Design a protein with these regions (language model features):
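Structural beta-strand/beta-sheet cores of well-ordered domains, especially the beta-sheet scaffolds
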Residues: 26-31, 89-91, 108-110, 127-130
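Short glycine/proline-rich turn/loop motifs
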Residues: 1, 113-119
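A long, amphipathic alpha-helix that forms part
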Residues: 1-28, 39-41, 45-86
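C-terminal cap/loop subdomain of S1 sulfatases and analogous C-terminal strand-loop tails that border
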Residues: 75-103, 118-127, 132-173
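A generic secondary-structure signal for well-formed alpha-helical elements
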Residues: 8-9, 15-23, 37-45, 114-115, ...
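Short, solvent-exposed turn/loop segments enriched in Gly/Ser/Thr/Pro and often Arg
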Residues: 32-39, 45-47, 100, 153-156
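Active-site-adjacent bridging/hinge elements
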Residues: 105-115
């Protein structure tokens, strides 16, 4: 996960730099959703070097893991952090994605950057949203109607609700 995030961060940085180089950064809406429904606790109390051991009910021991410590995160490993770290990653919420009834298992961070379109800057929002709300948000931001037909194919109405109502009003319901 850390390697994925580092790679993602580098490439998002390249995209942001390119948009800034053409002078359109403040006029570009960037929506970044970080995560995939909370961290995973499959690593148990000590973590695991290879998630296949979990699926095959093989218990990894600390003495098995320590000699491989420098290999963790490499292209031939499928490690999981320990459950303690998983809970820490989901702070301030409780639990992990294995416990969907708690916010640690269901909430992800989202950043919306659009200085020319959002008056509020650097504020936190607590309204609930879903990934299905992103397309309606972009359409409203661009003042575009929802497509009813694409290349002659009639489209079903979009699910989701634009988030524009909450971007300038932290107290919006």
């Amino acid at each position: 996960f850390a390697g994925f995030m580092e790679h993602t961060d580098v490439n998002i940085g390249r995209l942001v730099d390119a948009v800034e180089d053409i002078g359109e950064l403040d006029n570009t809406i960037i929506i970044y959703i970080a995560g995939d429904n909370g961290t995973s606790a499959e690593g148990g109390f000590i973590g695991m070097y290879n998630e296949m051991t979990y699926f095959n009910q093989v218990t990894e021991k600390v003495e098995d893991l320590l000699p491989r410590l420098d290999e963790w995160g490499g292209e031939y490993t499928f490690p999981h952090m320990s459950a303690g770290w998983a809970v820490a990653f989901d702070a301030p919420f409780k639990w992990t994605k294995q416990v969907a009834s708690d916010f640690g298992g269901t909430r992800n961070g989202m950043i919306v950057h659009w200085p020319d379109g959002i008056d509020s800057q650097g504020e936190i929002r607590n309204q609930f949203s879903h990934v299905i709300d992103i397309a309606p948000t972009i359409l409203e931001a661009a003042s575009l109607p929802e497509p009813t037909s694409v290349n002659g194919t009639v489209q079903e109405p979009m699910a989701g609700t634009s988030l524009m109502f909450s971007l300038n009003d932290a107290d919006a319901p």
